[in-house]
Amino acid sequence: DGAAAVIICKEALAKSFRPDPVRVKGIGLSVTSGEPYLKPSFAYTGFPATAQAAQSAYEQAGVTAKDIDLVECHDCFTITEILNYEDLGLCEKGEGWR
């Protein structure tokens, strides 16, 4: 499959690796019990926790999805990655495949 890693550290240490380190301006976390996914009405067309976490991170950072240049998105299945693009607000619902 693949792998990704991020080193999070103080700015002074980051600058010892490169002169222009990336700064984290916002983070978001949202979890569900899994219960919503058991409801017959759940359509499996997105992940509400992803949308909630994205909104929280965007608000903290003072940005919108349109300001994002790069996303490292977990893709355990192709459809999961596509739905995450939509839930992150990177595209309209139903347009993630583009």
Where in this protein do the model-derived segments appear?
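Condensing-enzyme catalytic core mediating Claisen C-C bond formation in acyl metabolism
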Residues: D1-Q52, S56
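Generic detector of well-ordered alpha-helical packing
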Residues: G2, C73-C76
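Weak global preference for isoleucine
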Residues: I7-I8, I27, I68, I79-I82
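Generic secondary-structure signature for well-ordered alpha-helical cores
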Residues: A12-K15, L29, E59-V63, E86, ...
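Beta-strand segments within the central parallel beta-sheet cores of soluble alpha/beta enzyme folds
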Residues: P19-L29, A65-H74, G94-R98
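Short glycine/threonine-rich loop-to-helix capping motif typified by GTGT followed
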Residues: P36-S41, D75-W97
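Phosphate/pyrophosphate-binding loops at sites that engage ATP/ADP/AMP, CoA/4′-phosphopantetheine
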Residues: A53-D67
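Generic hydrophobic alpha-helical scaffold/packing signal
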Residues: Q55, D69-E72, I82-Y85
